[in-house]
Amino acid sequence: MNKLIENCLFLKDKDRFNILRTKASDFRNTFIGETIVRDSIFDVIQNYVKSKEHEIKLLKFPIDDTELWAFTCLKDGIIFVTINTALPLNNQIFAAAHELYHIYKYIEDSQEEYIEKGSILTRKDFDEEDVSEEDREANAFAALILAPKEQIEKQIKITGREFTDSGLYDLIHFMDYFAMPYKGMVLKLFECGRYTEEQADILLQSESRKTLEEAYIHDCGTRWLEPTFENNLASLKALV
């Protein structure tokens, strides 16, 4: 079994996964509704924090190190979230949803250590097998927020999509629809029972480049595969 599958929260701790699924569903019902999140995740985070009467600064700028995806910290009562915009947009979106979990824990569970000490998301925390329990939960929460099972099943019913380890276009369609990274979408469809363990294992052994090339060929989802290089650091001037 691929280590990414073996170590995902869905298999590693189903009780904890089910608790997170309920929390994510409640969060969506209160702060998102039926909307497909995609790049509105940045507004979702800010609106959520402000609704809880906390202050937040969401900073976006390109960092010349694509191993670094995002980080969050607390300074003088202000929550600072930084997103690396040199990453493909779908990675930025997932990184933001991951950081949302740390913020959620801080606000809802009074777990100040989650961001007072700083939360840093790197590529290995998403892309590799061995991650901390905290980041494993944050990855699961992010996927539950961005692509809940109910919306996946609804989209499958509408489109009649099928999923095999050899036909990648249906997978790419869902990556596009939910603005999810490749491996995250494979794991999500496995979690929803749309891929068997064997199929997911084959797909996770494939080079991501193969998927990206096919996406370009079909002109599907290319928007999410490009960096934005957005820079809003000027918004910090008021704090200096």
Please tell me what each predicted stretch does.
Residues 1-240:
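Active-site hotspot residues in diverse enzymes, especially metal/ion-binding acidic/histidine motifs
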